[in-house]
Amino acid sequence: MTEKEKMLAEKWYDANFDQYLINERARAKDICFELNHTRPSATNKRKELIDQLFQTTTDNVSISIPFDTDYGWNVKLGKNVYVNTNCYFMDGGQITIGDNVFIGPNCGFYTATHPLNFHHRNEGFEKAGPIHIGSNTWFGGHVAVLPGVTIGEGSVIGAGSVVTKDIPPHSLAVGNPCKVVRKIDNDLPSETLNDETIK
């Protein structure tokens, strides 16, 4: 198996010294650099760079700068996704994001893990676990999502949370480690919106 194949199969792989992966990360960093230095008003150019980075045709994806990712091609984005400023997608493992997702500033999606034994860690070994984000979710600022986590549709993750385990659909979850506080009633029709139902 190539190191990329090992990475995608969630096996230990050479993250630091494999030339193909080094080149792929350099490609992504160059595109991120260009995106981060493109005027916000240059919407067509920004769309072109975002599509180039993720190697797909995105549908109403908005990314505020600065933004960073390791590869880009291992992120699968739905439509109507908003990524606020200073977010990082560590996409050695696949990061899947559904439709209508709001991601607050300073959020990180971290798919990588390293050996606890420093001898192995110093040799560059790494393993990546996927992250799955359901549609209609919202992340407050400074949220960290760790490898192997699935966050269910319609959930809200409070600011500053560290998500180490799966979050069920339609849940309000906060804290470090992130825990479900209560269920969210997502069946309320929009015309019932007021100071009480918006909580």
Curated annotation (Swiss-Prot):
Q: Which Gene3D superfamilies match?
A: Hexapeptide repeat proteins
Q: Record's Pfam families? A: Hexapep, Hexapep_2, Mac
Does the record's keyword annotation contain Transferase? yes
Q: What class of enzyme is it?
A: transferase
Report a single Gene Ontology molecular function. Answer: galactoside O-acetyltransferase activity
Q: Which UniProt keywords apply?
A: Acyltransferase, Repeat, Transferase
Q: What is its EC number?
A: 2.3.1.-
Of which family is this protein a member?
Belongs to the transferase hexapeptide repeat family.
Listed name of the protein? Putative acetyltransferase SACOL2570
Source organism of the structure: Staphylococcus aureus (strain COL)
